[in-house]
Amino acid sequence: MRQGTINNYIKLSKNFGGVRKCYEGKPSIAVGGFMCDPALMPTYPNAMAAGTLVYADESARTIVPIYTFKVKSVDTNKKTVTVEKFETGTIAKVGMKLIVVGNDLSDAATNVATVSAIDSSAEDVDVLSVDAVTGISEDAVLAEAGSDNKIKAVPNGLTYCDNAIDPDAYAIDIDYIWNCMEKPVLERRMPPLTASLKKALRDNECYFRFSNRK
């Protein structure tokens, strides 16, 4: 840490749990780095928050972030969806396809919202203009969808810290965690999860003790 900044509030951290400190303990990090396509990263200077869901391919040594969004409000007339934003910044991008996370991640969504514009002027929320708001309601959890209208990937881990990519970088490697049982994972300090997403983590041999306290 730079001298004289111990009492500062920062926008991202490479320490365990990121700037929001979503891990009380020191989780188990998977061995080795996993390469992430820079196009999948938030636009600089925004960052991917600690606790972001990921799918890591052990064979290919690649990693795909799975972005989730907590809906704060929906304007059906303007076709806008207001979503929670962390200190790490905006993670949505124009062209991103979003679906409501259902009870079964293997099901394709009937309704898909494609982001056409983003108002990121507020500190704590982003307002997403979309082509349709059908099926989206307050407090719903949205996730980025793939071409098959299912969640982009089934998660098998969480990021251990905040991650940002420099505008001059041509590649980035990201480490992920799969185990944090000794102390709780504070889910209210991380991107939103659903029961189905937690089940997917368990099914993929991830071991987390989630806590709903702040």
What are these regions (language model features)?
Residues 1-214:
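Surface-exposed, low-hydrophobicity beta-strand/loop segments enriched in small/polar/acidic residues
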